């Protein structure tokens, strides 16, 4: 045994009187922490995993543990798996993990684990769906309310026009990968486990291109400009995502296209605001219009002329409503338009206007001791 080999009890972090349950719990913690598929490319983690596995194999076995306690590493030289695969090592192994060991690692690493065969999943030979794309579209307030058709221009991966996505030159073909025998996976034994990884020779494809396409370099894809017409529905809200199926990147090995996600960003309007399906605006009226009432013309969001009735005695800030002039819902109805009244008080008066107001004041009488108004009664 190499002099540098650490004490097995120290490796697992238990004392020499530790029970089998203590050893199992300690190993479980280390196995999950340092497993190679959780720490891909981390050689230090892989070595710690092998070290913990070797220590567990010795200390969990009563006879091996007794020999180790008496003679140290020299007494158990050659008794551990040494990184190889030993089916007998799985006897009672699921008990360490409180049930299905494969379920635990499937949750940790994304599926496909089998302690005896297939390992931790990974890329398999076969069609791969293309990735989704995002497009941010800025539209006007008016277009958001009433809808529109918009032309989108963007670049995406498409199947190579020369090889039609095969990656091979015309007349050429693919051959089975000699290393993985067409499975796209290679198996590596580590302690208790047999782990499958994507084949480095074929990149997990299961086959090798003999003569790569000169246009795409063998990946079967090329970048192209794409132009599509998208219907923006009436009433679309700011931040809404619209999904356009199959307008994302092309897949590989016959895989489907991904989707295009169009995110809507609505510009502010100088005169109108929106709350759900209702629209809001503000109009000024004179103090005589507010006092006497009457009718005025206002412009709607779509430039129609609307007639608005002002009740006599209308107060500043009052909300008036015109039904059916709000946001279309797409189900045959529309929201309403709310108009906030802003009573304009003149800052300068002509002599005649001042005289008339003084006469009104004399008739009405000025209240020098007004009572407070409850805040709930304010418009």
Swiss-Prot record:
CDD domains, A to Z: DnaJ, DnaJ_C, DnaJ_zf
ZnF endpoints (CR-type): 147-225
Domain of life: Bacteria
UniProt key word Cytoplasm: yes
GO BP field: chaperone cofactor-dependent protein refolding; DNA replication; protein refolding; response to heat
Function: Participates actively in the response to hyperosmotic and heat shock by preventing the aggregation of stress-denatured proteins and by disaggregating proteins, also in an autonomous, DnaK-independent fashion. Unfolded proteins bind initially to DnaJ; upon interaction with the DnaJ-bound protein, DnaK hydrolyzes its bound ATP, resulting in the formation of a stable complex. GrpE releases ADP from DnaK; ATP binding to DnaK triggers the release of the substrate protein, thus completing the reaction cycle.
Subunit composition and interactions: Homodimer.
Stated name of the protein: Chaperone protein DnaJ
Organism: Treponema denticola (strain ATCC 35405 / DSM 14222 / CIP 103919 / JCM 8153 / KCTC 15104)
Gene: dnaJ
């Amino acid at each position: 045994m190499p002099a540098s080999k650490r004490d097995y009890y120290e490796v697992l972090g238990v004392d020499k009187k530790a029970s089998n349950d203590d050893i199992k719990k300690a190993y479980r913690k280390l196995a999950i922490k340092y497993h190679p598929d959780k720490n891909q490319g981390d050689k230090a983690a892989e070595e710690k995993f092998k070290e913990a596995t070797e220590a567990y194999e010795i200390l969990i076995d009563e006879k091996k543990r007794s020999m180790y306690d008496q003679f140290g590493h020299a007494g158990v030289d050659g008794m551990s798996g040494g990184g190889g695969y030993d089916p007998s090592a799985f006897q009672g192994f699921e008990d360490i993990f409180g049930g299905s060991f494969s379920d635990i690692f499937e949750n940790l690493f994304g599926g496909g684990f089998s302690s005896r065969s297939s390992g931790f999943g990974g890329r398999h030979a076969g069609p791969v769906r293309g990735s989704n794309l995002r497009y941010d579209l800025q539209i006007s307030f008016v277009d958001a309310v009433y809808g529109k058709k918009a032309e989108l221009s963007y670049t995406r991966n498409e199947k190579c026009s020369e090889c039609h996505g095969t990656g091979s030159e015309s007349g050429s073909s693919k051959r089975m990968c000699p290393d993985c025998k067409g499975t796209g996976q290679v198996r590596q034994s580590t302690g208790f486990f047999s782990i499958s990884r994507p084949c480095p020779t074929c990149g997990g494809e299961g086959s090798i291109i003999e003569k790569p396409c000169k246009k795409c370099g063998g990946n079967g894809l090329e970048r192209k400009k794409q132009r599509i017409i998208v219907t923006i529905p009436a009433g679309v809200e700011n931040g809404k995502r619209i999904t356009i199926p199959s307008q994302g990147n092309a897949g590989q090995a016959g895989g489907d296209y991904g989707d295009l996600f169009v995110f809507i960003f609505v510009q502010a309007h100088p005169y109108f605001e929106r709350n759900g399906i209702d629209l809001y605006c503000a109009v000024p009226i004179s103090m005589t219009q507010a006092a006497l009432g009457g009718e005025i013309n206002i412009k709607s969001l779509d430039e129609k002329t609307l007639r608005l009735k002002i009740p006599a005695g209308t107060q500043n800030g009052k909300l008036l409503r015109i039904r059916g002039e709000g946001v279309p819902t797409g189900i045959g109805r529309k929201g309403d338009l709310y108009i906030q009244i802003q009573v304009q008080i003149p800052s300068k008066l002509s002599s005649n206007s001042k005289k008339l107001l003084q006469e009104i004041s004399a008739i009405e009488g000025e209240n020098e001791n007004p009572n407070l108004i409850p805040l709930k009664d304010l418009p």
